[in-house]
Amino acid sequence: SEFLDAFNTGRLHHGWLITGPRGVGKATLAWRIARFLLATPLVHEEGLFGAPPPPETLDIAPDHPVSRRLLALSDPGLFLLRRGPTDKGDRLAAEIRVSEVRKLGNFFALSAADGGRRVVIVDAADDLNTQAANAILKMLEEPPARTVMLLVSHQPSGLLPTIRSRCRTLRLAPLGPQEMAQALEHAGI
């Protein structure tokens, strides 16, 4: 709700740090936010019947074109930053290297599709090595226009303090038994 409030009041921050214990849904939330941002118009233009009401949820239909493109990792407005392959290419590297972060430069050099937003998901920011963390920090200090960076972190205390200070934090916690029961009931389970 904090993210949606910021969106609906026009105070959408360029950097969001999504934190919480492993398995709580941080990456899932990052993908939902990305889908929402890429599928929702930048400006609520007034049409024949006035401006549409502000969105109440982050829900985007699974058959929406943006949903399909994100599922295929082919949306031009999304950049996924995660550990890449080792030099041998036989497994994933132990950390996100600065060479992976530099690829963001090419992404930002292109204008956003349809003049819309660009979204970067860093999953997980805990995996950034020192040089990569400093490169991300520079982008957070001078963000490109209409870009939102979503940093997933299991241990935010391990990140550079300056990265934490440049982001708004969304702290996730496991659902309690009553909240879990309500969620299951709402889902029809």
Predicted regions and their residues:
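Non-catalytic interfacial helical region
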Residues: V24, P85-I189
